[in-house]
Regions:
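Active-site anion-handling motifs in enzyme catalytic cores
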Residues: 1-400
Length: 400
């Protein structure tokens, strides 16, 4: 069965001679997206082809048998997926949505959808390839929001597929061994944003640690953070430059801040090189979930500083070390990171296997053969029998 994977690019070709704007656009406006696109590609290969959101539905139907959409936090009033709903209706193919999350100020709040996103949700649910859930969500809160919006039996908690990149079933033990050593000589920080005022003091402490440990400050989003990481100063106005400097390193002169960025700031153009780099670090901590997740997939301990419901939900679902930003101490050192972010190896290992089982069940129910690496993360004794998949979904009337 050939899969049409609706997703940003897995990597940016010839990024060295491309603009920061090109890199940012191809990443889907956040380089953290490389993590789950890499995961889905590896789990679905070799019978998979990536299509952008604006792809022709006729082309997808001609070349593929099923659609798998790499989702993010699309459940919320900030999102309007009307055009994608129309594309999916016209493609007339079975659909899986993987990694869907809800965005709210706090867990427990009710998320209201735009009419376009509600239509998209109805279209995805109606194109289920089997008599089984076809929407993999990030956590229980997101599952409840799918149910609240009329799709009671369509969603299943699978977490984020980036949690299953590394095919080593003993990954938890590898992370735990390094975590227990407690020796933190080099730290990487997946950076926040210069307008996240509530995180400013914490970010400066993290930046101090980066400097003290010859570490890295990794930009993921927004475009000006990417420009900063690539020394793309000519495409940045003075006001933005000074806003960045005042957030990251307010005590430095303009020239010294540029030099600091050359030494410590970076961004990545694919998940593989990102994980390879993280192997050489002792700890990774910051407000970006996927920046921490990629480090953990490389066997490096990490912790997420959460500041919203979507980040907290993912961490709690997958047993990723996490602290809310307002629970962080005012001052801390690199050596404090392992105790601030305790790693529950046995719990992480069990949950990782449980989520892998659910994810594999969803794929096999749809008639998709999971990769050998993904299958190796499951525990066959707890896997449910796979329902029979349908080859095609009949044409769906436009959902209102």
């Amino acid at each position: 069965m050939k899969v049409a994977l609706i997703a940003p690019q897995m990597w940016v070709h010839e990024s060295y001679c491309r603009s920061s704007d090109h890199l940012f656009r191809k990443s889907g406006a956040n380089t953290g997206n490389f993590a789950f696109v890499h995961a889905l590609w590896s789990h679905l290969s070799p019978h998979v082809e990536i299509f952008p959101w604006e792809a022709s539905p006729e082309m997808m139907r001609e070349r593929c048998d099923i659609i798998v959409m790499a989702c993010a936090n699309q459940l919320g009033p900030h999102s309007n997926l009307e055009q994608l709903a129309i594309t999916f209706e016209r493609a007339k193919l079975p659909i899986l949505a993987i990694g869907l999350g809800a965005q709210a100020r706090e867990l427990g709040a009710t998320v209201e959808l735009t009419a376009g996103t509600r239509r998209w949700l109805d279209v995805v649910a109606a194109h289920a390839p089997a008599n089984a859930p076809n929407i993999g969500v990030r956590g229980e809160f997101s599952r409840q929001q799918v149910e609240h919006n009329g799709q009671r039996d369509r969603a299943m908690v699978t977490g984020c597929p980036s949690n299953l990149i590394n095919p080593d079933p003993s990954l938890a033990n590898r992370i735990d061994e390094r975590h227990r050593l407690g020796r933190v000589e080099r730290v990487a920080v997946p950076a926040g944003l210069h307008h996240w005022v509530k995180l400013a003091k914490i970010e400066r402490v993290l930046v101090d640690i980066v400097e003290q440990t010859s570490g890295l400050y990794i930009a993921q989003s927004e475009i000006d953070m990417i420009r900063m990481a690539r020394a793309d100063w000519d495409n940045m106005d003075d006001a933005t430059f000074h806003s960045l400097r005042n957030y990251v390193r307010p005590g430095l002169s303009d020239d010294d801040f540029r030099l600091w960025c050359k030494r410590h700031a970076t961004c990545f153009i694919d998940a593989a090189s990102w994980m390879e780099s993280m192997r050489t670090f002792d700890f990774v901590a910051g407000p970006r979930f996927h920046g921490v997740m990629l480090a953990m997939q490389a066997g490096t301990p990490g912790g997420v500083i959460a500041h919203d419901s979507r980040t907290l939900e993912m961490c709690e679902t997958m047993i990723i070390p996490v602290r809310m930003h307002d629970d962080m101490p005012a001052s801390f050192a690199a050596s404090d990171l392992p105790s601030l972010f305790e790693f529950e190896a046995a719990a992480y290992d069990r949950r990782r296997s449980e989520l892998a089982n659910r994810y594999v069940d969803m794929l096999t129910a749809a008639g998709i053969a999971p990769s050998v690496g993904l299958l190796g993360l499951t525990r066959s004794e707890s896997a449910a029998p796979a329902p029979v998949a349908l080859q095609r979904t009949p044409e769906l009337a436009a959902a209102s």
